[in-house]
Amino acid sequence: MLLKIFALLCVPVSILIFASMNAALWVLPLVYALCLVVTLLLAAAFLFFICALVDNTKPQPEDNKFYRAAMYLYIELILQVLGVTIDTKGLEHIPTGRRFMVVCNHQSETDPAFIHHYFRKSQLAFLSKKEAAKLPVFGPMMHMTSCQMVNRQNDREAMRAIIKCIQMIKEDKVSVCAFPEGGIIETDKLSHFRSGVFKIAQKANVPIVVCTLKNTSSVLHKLKRLQHIHVRLHLVGIIPEWEHAEMTTVEIADKVYNMMLEDLGEEYRPAVAQNT
């Protein structure tokens, strides 16, 4: 939709430019193409500008509505420009009118973008590795949209991030999304889960929305080769709070793992997988 708006806005501008040039008619498509490219470059420049204004060291007490809206718009624009095809299933079951926790397998740095795109009405905040805060554009956007960074080398800091997620859900500020594998896996195999992350859903007393992503590991590779990008996002199921309240976090991890594996297929099963 956003790309179509840009394309339509470029029509009168390119016609005006063409009229002032007094050039041959075949020049008009070139003027239009150049106008569209310049518009997209200006949009990219604006994104980098607003991200440059963010101080990642300064605590962000509230979710920033401007940066969240900008993030959604740019994700939509980028997916349209790249011509990404996304097959979805089960997303009609996304809870409405309440907070929840989303968990998904993790294949690529682009995973949050696909999840954000379809959960934009849910106001998600991601639990992410600390290193992500240093990434240009991604880091500032995550900081301004209540994402919590986890230091995987420091259990105390990791627990603080989990407690903060619980607090934000209880205060009805955001819903939370986490990747229980704990990081991007180099192969497509579903790695073992870090069960501690499920404390968020238990302590906040919210349902767990189980999702799976396929083919995102090849997104950046295909982008470099200008190949078509085809991604799949499924909502596999929902574990209500009354069900997981009586389970240990390891039992929850095992249940979620099996739900994901059943949807992804046996080719995603590793040789050895033990949730901890």
State what each model feature region is.
Residues L2-S14, A23-R99:
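Membrane-anchoring hydrophobic helices of lipid-metabolizing enzymes
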Residues F18-A19:
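Alpha-helical transmembrane spans
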Residues C51-Y72, Q80, T96-D155:
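Catalytic core of membrane glycerolipid acyltransferases/transacylases, capturing the structured
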Residues T88, Q148-N151, E241:
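Short acidic-hydrophobic, aromatic-tinged amphipathic segments that line or gate anion-handling sites
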Residues T88, V102, F126, L233-L235:
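Generic preference for hydrophobic
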Residues M159-T276:
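Non-catalytic C-terminal accessory region of glycerolipid acyltransferases
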